[in-house]
Amino acid sequence: MASDGASALPGPDMSMKPSAAPSPSPALPFLPPTSDPPDHPPREPPPQPIMPSVFSPDNPLMLSAFPSSLLVTGDGGPCLSGAGAGKVIVKVKTEGGSAEPSQTQNFILTQTALNSTAPGTPCGGLEGPAPPFVTASNVKTILPSKAVGVSQEGPPGLPPQPPPPVAQLVPIVPLEKAWPGPHGTTGEGGPVATLSKPSLGDRSKISKDVYENFRQWQRYKALARRHLSQSPDTEALSCFLIPVLRSLARLKPTMTLEEGLPLAVQEWEHTSNFDRMIFYEMAERFMEFEAEEMQIQNTQLMNGSQGLSPATPLKLDPLGPLASEVCQQPVYIPKKAASKTRAPRRRQRKAQRPPAPEAPKEIPPEAVKEYVDIMEWLVGTHLATGESDGKQEEEGQQQEEEGMYPDPGLLSYINELCSQKVFVSKVEAVIHPQFLADLLSPEKQRDPLALIEELEQEEGLTLAQLVQKRLMALEEEEDAEAPPSFSGAQLDSSPSGSVEDEDGDGRLRPSPGLQGAGGAACLGKVSSSGKRAREVHGGQEQALDSPRGMHRDGNTLPSPSSWDLQPELAAPQGTPGPLGVERRGSGKVINQVSLHQDGHLGGAGPPGHCLVADRTSEALPLCWQGGFQPESTPSLDAGLAELAPLQGQGLEKQVLGLQKGQQTGGRGVLPQGKEPLAVPWEGSSGAMWGDDRGTPMAQSYDQNPSPRAAGERDDVCLSPGVWLSSEMDAVGLELPVQIEEVIESFQVEKCVTEYQEGCQGLGSRGNISLGPGETLVPGDTESSVIPCGGTVAAAALEKRNYCSLPGPLRANSPPLRSKENQEQSCETVGHPSDLWAEGCFPLLESGDSTLGSSKETLPPTCQGNLLIMGTEDASSLPEASQEAGSRGNSFSPLLETIEPVNILDVKDDCGLQLRVSEDTCPLNVHSYDPQGEGRVDPDLSKPKNLAPLQESQESYTTGTPKATSSHQGLGSTLPRRGTRNAIVPRETSVSKTHRSADRAKGKEKKKKEAEEEDEELSNFAYLLASKLSLSPREHPLSPHHASGGQGSQRASHLLPAGAKGPSKLPYPVAKSGKRALAGGPAPTEKTPHSGAQLGVPREKPLALGVVRPSQPRKRRCDSFVTGRRKKRRRSQ
């Protein structure tokens, strides 16, 4: 079907099959090579007259995909590179009507065996084997001018192609529409050659132009998409491949495209973003060119399809429509024309660019209108003042509606308050200082629940009480921070001041107060308005004044010289004045205490020790408290206090001398870390010992104490004492037990005590004379003794001297002053080597009686004796602490609590009873009972000898109406190494007793015999002044069980848990000679600690306060040792 001399390819497959043509596979006409020799290598610019006859001169189909020349010559033509050349099927589809019928032409083109000819050489003149792949230079010379919609098939399936990349390049190469039209199908192809040559010439002239790069970019774009299909940089990479592949072709002409492409991609990855920007810009322009070109092509196709007629020869029918569609490029868009037309396009784009940014600058009319309105409104507000005022009023009303301004009535009320000078001056007193401190110090950790609880408790306080409490807290804080001698004392962040809340029946019950760094909480109620405590430190007095500084009997209470204690007591009953305490010593802090209107004593405990004394109309209750670590005290409902043993660090001895009408000698110093707990209530004498959340055991003092007078020490240690006096019935405190009956006369039995050599003698210089004719009265009708602290026998001790408490305690209540001119004497006899150790003697004193105490260094293992407190007529100890360093008349009870302390818990609403909880460690003081029964007759008319305690165990004695509580009363005696010392409770005169006391003694007698075997553990007497038992964190105290009778309750003795175990099972032991607090008819039930047993090297002294976990006990502790086994041990 070819023209003259034209022959088909050697393979009969080279044919085009139009889908609409009558001939299914018409032969593709090719001109003979002789007619146009340079037509055979279609990829080379000069010889392409024949290729344009079949394909347009711009068609790079075979050139780009197949570097070798196509076999288009006749049979046996010199251009045949090999008979086994590969075949490429090219499908050309055209759609159209009758003029341009839809056609699908398949071109089966063979490929030579990778041979190429030099440009301009005839088909037969092969230069030899060329690179199997098209190099960059070759590709450059055959850039197509147009892309056509011709699809190729078959290259991937070419088996003879040794390198697969050749087949892979076929789909990548963009096919271009290059049909020459009906003119080139005549056979000779001359017109087509003449048409295509100018375009080739133009293309060669602009080979280095951007248009050439654009064509290469079109080719490389598909290649780049294959390697970077997911990358948005495909267009830029295509631009990058143009110069890179060209350079690689020049450096290594033998490098194939597939070898060079990975290198180019790698180079692209190492290119910086800045360098890539050039290629991004180039790709952007190329994309614009492509879009414009596609638009032009579409226009040309539409125009050409309308103006061209189909080819007349039947065999060329399919070519006619094709030509009408795609072969117009050489004629209408020659390369030169394309370059000419592209220039105006660029200028046109440049001309269009300026308007493009102008479009966004156009402001919408709505925005312009809004802007104008805003400007007019702004100008109008400034010009029209009236309008502005109206708007401001509207804004103000709106703000008020939003709640920005409070109610005008509230504003006026605030202004009125601020105008009052008192309101402004008391702001600090009303606002909680600790709360402010917490707010200003974000570093401190504050428990909000504790603060809320404290604030709720404060709701029950009156304004005067609240102001007093705040002032005291502020002064304490200043005192704790200002003095340099306080040895780094700091206030704890726990709730400050002593607070109280009201229970159901309106009575106040104290709750935990301020705690110092080394002190304990002082419980009590703040004194009435107008009272201010005055604390004197270093000679400087700080406000703590009371408008009424008179005692009820009209006598003022001067401050002792050593203490500079200046209590200003209120004249009215139950309204004691605040008590100021001065500490002159080695950096110990004495904190002022506040007195409550109803007799409660409260004070904030600063670091160090604080004396809390409540002076009711007749009573001067004193409370000592030793604390170690400031901790939050468990809720103390009814004046509960924990007694921590006095800290023996430095063996600082402390003597408290309080006199009414006379100066007390002796240096009153509180041991470091100890602080008296606020205890007494209105009209009631009571001492409460509280541990400041530290371990209840005291610091062990010197094991090898050197004998020296107490005066040599910087301060004298004061054992906890209790002064009970005046009306207990008037107690506004909600004690668990109220004292219904008290001993009319209290007499201290002469007790024989031994103390070890090498220990300092205790006592005060001179005899302690209590006001003659005075009897101590804890309640309205009777007086009782509440022993506190370690062992009960706490009289001033001295080597070979006996300390006397000469003055009888005065009973302030008229009906109970039956026993006047009575004295308490404690006689010390025996060998000096046996030192009465760890004795804690509660001192009862009122009004004019003086009291002092000194602390001696006691070895923990020394034998001690128990002092039995009883009533004795005008007995005195002539030599009272001659060696003690306390100046002035002072009685020196001892409390050397070295380790865990025993707990005395009192709890009842009817009668005050003693609740004893014995600590696991025994006391050092030993009482002796020759009879081995360890009991005292109820009336104490005849003295009883107490068997020596094996483990220095002691019992606290509680005075009953006719019986003075004895050491044996609370605990059975244990044999000890020596029995040289025997405590003989004796009563010379006993006044009539209350009927409840008789019943109590009867009950005690019944239970004494059954439980005397278990009385060995008597080293704890703990006084609790709360209606709810305070359970220590480690060892909870069991609640008291109501015993019926007259409403009194039995203070069940609770066993503190051992070092590792929970609290031991208590078992009560009744004692005939023991009364709780001379109060309720119910006898005190003591449950000795089961852990105590014979053979224990040391017994820990008793202390008032919640049982705390002791330091590692140095004795064996069998929590459940029966009395029989203990008895057998004693027999051994």
UniProtKB/Swiss-Prot annotation:
Keyword terms: Chromosomal rearrangement, Cytoplasm, Methylation, Nucleus, Phosphoprotein
Organism: Homo sapiens
Source taxon at top rank: Eukaryota
List of residues that carry Phosphoserine: 1026, 1029, 1031
Coarse class of the protein's main subcellular location: cytoplasm
Compositional bias (Pro residues): 21-36
A cellular component term, taken from the record's GO annotations: nucleus
Biased segments, Polar residues type: 487-497, 697-706, 883-892, 950-971
Annotated region (Disordered), positions in chain: 1-56, 337-365, 383-405, 476-584, 693-714, 873-892, 922-1017, 1031-1132
Disease: A chromosomal aberration involving NUTM1 is found in a rare, aggressive, and lethal carcinoma arising in midline organs of young people. Translocation t(15;19)(q14;p13) with BRD4 which produces a BRD4-NUTM1 fusion protein. A chromosomal aberration involving NUTM1 is found in a rare, aggressive, and lethal carcinoma arising in midline organs of young people. Translocation t(15;9)(q14;q34) with BRD3 which produces a BRD3-NUTM1 fusion protein.
Function of the protein: Plays a role in the regulation of proliferation. Regulates TERT expression by modulating SP1 binding to TERT promoter binding sites.
In-chain residues carrying the UniProt-annotated modification N5-methylglutamine: 1046
Gene field: NUTM1
One Pfam short name: NUT
Keyword Cytoplasm: yes
Ranges of compositional bias, category Acidic residues: 395-404
Family to which this protein belongs: Belongs to the NUT family.
Keyword Glycoprotein attributed: no
Tissue specificity field: Specifically expressed in testis.
Compartment(s) of residence: Cytoplasm; Nucleus
Protein name as catalogued: NUT family member 1
